[in-house]
A protein has these predicted regions:
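Conserved small/polar residues in nucleotide/adenosyl-binding loops
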Residues: 373-380
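Hydrophobic alpha-helical segments and their helix-loop junctions in multi-pass secondary transporters
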Residues: 27-39, 63-78, 207-220, 224, ...
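Selective recognition of specific alpha-helical transmembrane segments in multi-pass small-molecule
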Residues: 22, 99-108, 198-209, 235-250, ...
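N-terminal alpha-helical transmembrane segments of multi-pass membrane transport
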Residues: 2-134
Length: 380
């Protein structure tokens, strides 16, 4: 009996989605390794084409998703439970917040915590650089990028997966959420294509996050211990982080991932609180409040603003806003699967409210603390 027949008999048949995704990923990595300069040039050209030709679509899509989430919170649909009527949440609320926050943002908040608002302060889209107005503009822009749009995208994908999985008994595959539209075609080549596309998009999102994390860790090691800031060191860091992630995932949600998420959110909260106390506390709170008001006041305009006749701002949007919208969309299959898995037993209203509001508010506080503490230290 050959190995393929043996695997099928033992229920270990390798999924076509895995095979196709692995082949595509290997080809892309191989091309990038052999032709790094050309690969970088081509991917940049593709990015520029997407942001130039499809930027309007990204803005409309993500904004519709935000308002769809708001509709779900206040509609009767919100009463539906993600699971059977007697199902209870598997994780307590604090651990649930910790896990979805760690999966959704993680290293991004650390990497961009001070860097992004400081960049906007030095070169704001709608204010004079390094002025009082630039502070508010910097935080408003950062809140906009890391706030409701990002978490609405995550929330809708996670909700679709959770509903299909826990109420309809479907596997946790993105293709199966489209059964009401595609019918049984989701079990054929069309479904495989959708799942391969979502896996590849996830790989791209993971690559960005791992790359940023490696740069951040390498920078810290270089500053503290003089470890060389090189590609090889960053590759080793990525390997170590990947091994730790696999070990955590292997130990299960209720052990490794839950404990790591709680530790992650605990250390992050401790760092944020200490920084808030030793920094310009009142100024941080005042600026956070003002910038939140500015965000809400300009929310609709900025959600649809394509800067069609403003070349400088359009270039800024390509670098920041549209880049983020693409990043959140590419990351959403992975984050959505995880959030769906840990949210069984919660109502749709509770689910959307928690996913949309809590992480966004925490992000606002984090960025306010990072910007004002960093700029205050720089002034001194």
């Amino acid at each position: 009996m050959n190995s393929s027949s043996s695997n099928e008999k033992n229920g270990k048949k390798i999924s076509p989605v895995f095979i196709y995704s692995a082949i595509i990923a290997a080809i892309v990595v191989l091309i990038g390794a052999i032709f790094p300069t050309q690969f970088d040039s081509v991917t940049n050209e593709v990015k520029m084409w997407i942001t130039d030709k499809l930027g309007w679509y990204y803005l409309i899509l993500t904004t519709i998703i935000v308002f769809f989430c708001i509709f779900l919170i206040f509609s009767p649909i919100g009463k539906l439970k993600l699971g059977k009527p007697n199902d209870k949440p598997e994780f307590n609320t604090i651990s649930w917040f910790a896990m979805l926050f760690s999966a959704g943002m993680g290293i991004g908040l650390v990497f961009y915590g001070a860097a992004e608002p400081m960049s906007h302060f030095a070169s704001p889209p709608d204010a004079d650089p390094k002025t009082t107005e630039a502070y508010t503009e910097a935080l408003r822009s950062t809140f906009f990028h890391w706030g409701f749009h990002a978490w609405a995208v995550y929330g809708v994908v996670a909700l679709a997966l959770a509903y299909a999985q826990f109420r309809k008994g479907e596997p946790g595959l993105l293709s199966r959420t489209l059964r009401p539209i595609l019918g049984d075609k989701v079990e054929g080549p069309i479904g495989t294509f959708i799942d391969v596309l979502s896996v590849f998009a996830t790989l791209v999102g993971v690559a960005v996050s791992l790359g940023m994390g490696a740069l951040q860790i390498n920078g810290g090691l270089n500053y503290l211990f003089g470890v060389p800031n090189t590609t090889w060191v960053q590759a080793i860091i990525i390997v170590i982080v990947t091994i730790l992630f696999i070990a955590s995932a292997w130990s299960g949600l209720s052990k490794g991932i839950q404990y790591l998420s709680n530790l992650n959110i605990g250390l992050g909260a401790l760092l944020m609180i200490i920084t808030l106390i030793i920094g310009p506390t009142v100024l941080i709170l005042n600026m956070m409040t003002s910038s939140t008001g500015s965000l809400l006041n300009t929310f609709l305009f900025n959600s649809f603003d394509t800067a069609a006749l403003n070349g400088q701002k359009r270039e800024w949007m390509s670098t920041w806003t549209l880049y983020y919208w693409g990043w959140w969309l590419s990351w959403s299959p992975f984050v959505g699967v995880f959030i769906a898995r840990v949210s069984k037993g919660r109502s749709i209203r509770e689910f959307i409210s928690g996913v949309l509001l809590v992480p966004a508010i925490v992000s606002f506080i984090w960025f306010s603390v990072c910007l004002l503490y960093t700029s205050d230290a720089a002034d001194e």
